[in-house]
């Protein structure tokens, strides 16, 4: 949010940017706004209302600096970039509301899964290995991904990526003091890596999506059953096999492939 925003109530009459209507970010921010007694609208926000608008993540920091929006919710490192440029601050971390929530996932064509499962398995193995590397070698990952890195994987500065992947303890303590982190006992990371799509997460995702304001035609959600959707959308065979290699379950801190969902505003 902008530096002058200290509470959700300060966002009434303003615009908040989201990356996509069907994003985890939209779900979480609407839950936050509703708890604060604020209504979501798509245009002309009045008192007690907040306008949500879809915006490319790369445009969000500039829009915040220009005071075109009061805040945004999106994946890193754009939040850290706003902090680094002193145009924004963290009001709340999404992982402090929905514990261990997923952000991104990997999609495969059914044709590939059916016709070349070995190739699919190799792709998933590589993704799991990369996640394990990034989880345990955070500073090195920041350097590899930075614009200063040999392959220039991202346009982001190494300092910004380090703030995301391996923030200084004093900075983390500041977040606890300001209330950006309210569940310190969850021991959440600003960004973490975990490759398994838990059934409980997927069910809650669909359930909350059905409660969320979405632009456009979305009546198809009326007939979607959370439990059935969670079962049918994910083929976990490949990631389960990948996790059985070389003690990767313990590398990700997984004792089983079952988990209870935790959502607390």
What positions do the PLM features span?
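Conserved C-terminal helix/tail region of periplasmic/extracytoplasmic solute-binding proteins
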Residues: 202-265
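Residue-level detector of family-conserved "landmark" positions at structurally sensitive sites
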Residues: 10, 21, 43, 92-93, ...
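Secondary-structure end/capping motifs
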Residues: 115-221
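Pocket-lining segment of extracytoplasmic ligand-binding domains
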Residues: 46, 59-161, 165
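Residues that recognize and position ribonucleotide moieties
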Residues: 53, 106, 195
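Residue-level recognition of the GNAT/N-acetyltransferase active site
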Residues: 1-2, 109
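Bilobed "Venus flytrap"/periplasmic-binding protein-like clamshell domains
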Residues: 2-84, 98-102, 203
């Amino acid at each position: 949010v902008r530096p002058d925003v200290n509470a959700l109530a300060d966002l009434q009459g303003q615009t908040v940017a989201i990356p996509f209507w069907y994003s985890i970010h939209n779900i979480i921010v609407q839950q936050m706004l509703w708890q604060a007694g604020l209504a979501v609208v798509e245009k002309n926000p009045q008192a007690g209302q907040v306008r949500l608008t879809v915006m490319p993540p790369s445009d969000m920091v500039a829009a915040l600096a220009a005071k075109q929006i009061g805040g945004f919710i999106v994946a890193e490192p754009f939040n850290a970039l706003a902090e680094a440029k002193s145009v924004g601050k963290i009001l709340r971390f999404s992982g402090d509301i929905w514990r261990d929530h997923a952000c991104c996932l990997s999609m495969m064509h059914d044709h590939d899964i059916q016709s070349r499962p070995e190739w699919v398995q190799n792709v998933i193995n590589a993704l799991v290995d990369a996640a394990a590397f990034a989880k345990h070698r955070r500073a090195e990952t920041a350097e590899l991904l930075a614009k200063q890195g040999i392959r220039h994987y991202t346009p982001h500065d190494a300092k910004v990526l380090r703030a995301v992947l391996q923030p200084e303890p004093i900075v983390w303590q500041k977040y606890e003091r300001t209330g950006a982190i309210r569940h310190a006992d969850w021991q959440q990371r600003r960004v973490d890596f975990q490759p398994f799509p838990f059934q409980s997460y997927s069910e809650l995702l669909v359930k909350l999506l059905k409660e969320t304001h979405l632009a456009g035609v979305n009546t198809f959600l009326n007939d979607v059953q959370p439990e059935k959707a969670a079962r049918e959308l994910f083929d976990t065979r490949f990631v389960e096999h990948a996790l059985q290699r070389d003690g990767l379950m313990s590398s990700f801190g997984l004792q089983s492939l079952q988990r209870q969902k935790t959502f607390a505003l």
